[in-house]
Amino acid sequence: MANLAGRRMMAEIDGDFVVFLIGARFNSFHLLKTVLDLGGRRGMKHMLDYLVAHPEKGLLGYQMGLPTIVQYWRSFDHLEAFANDAGDPHVAVWRNYWRRVGTSARTGIWHETYLVRAGEYEAIYGNMPPFGLGQAGRWFR
């Protein structure tokens, strides 16, 4: 591991961008059913792998977490196009989620979307490797 002691870094992205928070709430303790509700190997990880392989879709980067994933997008238009294009994996994953879960309340899902205007944010990191916006954008001292 690199020596990160005393290291202060910042991050920036050129132009406006979108921060997309998405997560799940486990309302049941049936772990296997919950993982299956969220799509298993054909769920979020599958979509993120697809987006990384297709940078023209507009995903700038993401940070995995439980239960929340932070995604950075070039624009809301890019995010919305991905969400609604039947040729991209989201539409099928979304339909399959509702088919599996239906009216069951085992697993809840949510998202929040924020438009960030160029220069109207701050991203500072202490004793950290590139993380969050620092992975999606430019990392500097």
Regions found by a protein language model. Name each.
Residues 1-65, 81, 105-141:
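Short S/T/G/P-rich N-terminal loop/turn motif that feeds into the first structured element of a domain
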Residues 76-109:
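An amphipathic, aromatic/His-enriched active-site/gating alpha helix that lines ligand/cofactor pockets
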Residues 72-74:
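Tryptophan-centric aromatic hotspots in well-structured domains and transmembrane helices
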